[in-house]
Amino acid sequence: MSPPRAVSAALVVDANILVAAVLGSSTGPHLDLISGRRSLITSEAAFEEAYKVVGHVRPSDLFVLESLLDLVTIIAREDVADEDLAAAETALRIAPASRNGSVTDAHLLALAWTLDADLWSHDRDFAGTGWPSWSTANLLAAV
């Protein structure tokens, strides 16, 4: 048996990680710690989703979300190939873990493929796609 795969040098960060970092969970300090060990990247759509959620729940903390831009790089939608996005939608639609057929995070999976980066998310949607994804707890144990 081979040893477990190491965490990739870059991580694609889901909106729920950004929201958790802003709204006071321990994810904030973890984001800072992990950014010192890995490149953190997200999509425009994920950052916009986080902005919308934080703006609705706690608009006074939007500046905290904006400060995360010092740690996380945003990649534009046009930097991901349309065929990768379509393939990611298909992979998520048939993934057994979530069984809900949701393709809303296909942009993150396609970005991860484009960059050959693992995913960091609290969602189970990526399980079953064949692409590495990490919860915060598992990621901290691995880096």
Please report, for each region that a protein language model flagged, where it lies by residue.
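Short, well-structured N-terminal submotif of metal-dependent ribonuclease cores
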Residues: M1-T42
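Glycine-rich, phosphate-binding/catalytic loops in enzymes
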Residues: G28-L31, R58-P59, W131, T136-N138
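Acidic active-site catalytic centers that drive phospho-/nucleotidyl reactions
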Residues: D14, D105, D123
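PIN-domain endoribonuclease scaffold, especially VapC-family toxins
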Residues: I34-L40, E44-I94
